[in-house]
């Protein structure tokens, strides 16, 4: 099958959220399975620092009265062909910025559609989030090209219809009041990144005002769990952590804890409970809940806590203020740093993820992969990936809570803090998480089955 992934992000070149990990990993697995899979993404101004891009384009076109160029290269450390959409709107050195994102990504989507019609013609265009949402609309009457639309986060729905009608060709038959709604209606298949999230977005609590539409298209809605690149994220050979280890040499992991404590200025003590969090600092990730319990938890325990991420200025400021009250025990790192995030996964005892909603979540998978015990709220993909820890029967992979309430989060954190004292059970809990198989191979089989059903191909 010929499949083109269209996305605003792709690891390791351009990443803000989990969408980048999906687009950077899934095509590689599908290609190894014998399919002609390629990626189409913007030519951001910073890409030249990360890879070599040919000076001459392979194709030129016009979209929304704008000329653009297509450059062909290869996704780093893979054999996946990569098409870069070249236009001055994407030359600034940030993925998302300013007030013209709606225009920039509508142009990008239009350029991708033009390339599919007149350049390299796939059998399936796999679109990702609102940035590519107009592609299924434009391709609705192209019978030999099918479209898949993956919802990574329903909260971000793109520009409204009146705006699209003003800036570009918007078919008269387009339905839906924004890009996300239109994509969901016109795509041949719609996927979300976990089975639980696929069910939740059909309810008012999680549907972001599209729950009725999601229920209406339930026949073509699929929840396929995300995976992780088990080779790219592997504590046995990760060059970004001080000490490599695996499930059979878990005793070596403490060296990473000590190194992390030294790096952020904590007291070096292997017996201290070290908790970490790598996240966007936004309400979705449970920051409002954390602000209600973190100060009290830090005051009544000797926990060490490191937070990595950026987001809303309010949450950044509040976290800084709490950290200032616990010098040497709490560190707030307001930046994007993949190397530091890996050291947090490899060095912390527990990983905090109290999300209000979570389509799938990658961080909890990486935490378990590296032996950090997740503390999560049971929502979306966190339900599908982290099983409740029962110390009596010694089963489960993490600490979890159901209600989005401060007391429930605090209880889960205290349970983890107390559980850390029982070293043998804690190590068994770590090993169970590290043995979990969240590779893309299993997820890829689900996508292949769906692709074949779209094209009328028999399942092998």
From Swiss-Prot:
Keywords: Glycogen biosynthesis, Glycosyltransferase, Transferase. Synthesizes alpha-1,4-glucan chains using ADP-glucose. Pfam families: Glyco_transf_5, Glycos_transf_1. It comes from the Bacteria. Its EC number is 2.4.1.21. Belongs to the glycosyltransferase 1 family. Bacterial/plant glycogen synthase subfamily. It catalyses: [(1->4)-alpha-D-glucosyl](n) + ADP-alpha-D-glucose = [(1->4)-alpha-D-glucosyl](n+1) + ADP + H(+). CDD domains: GT5_Glycogen_synthase_DULL1-like (cd03791). The keyword Glycosyltransferase applies. GO terms for biological process: glycogen biosynthetic process. ADP-alpha-D-glucose binds at residue 15. Pathway: Glycan biosynthesis; glycogen biosynthesis. One of its GO terms (molecular function) is alpha-1,4-glucan glucosyltransferase (ADP-glucose donor) activity. SUPFAM superfamilies: UDP-Glycosyltransferase/glycogen phosphorylase. This is Glycogen synthase. HAMAP family: Glycogen_synth.
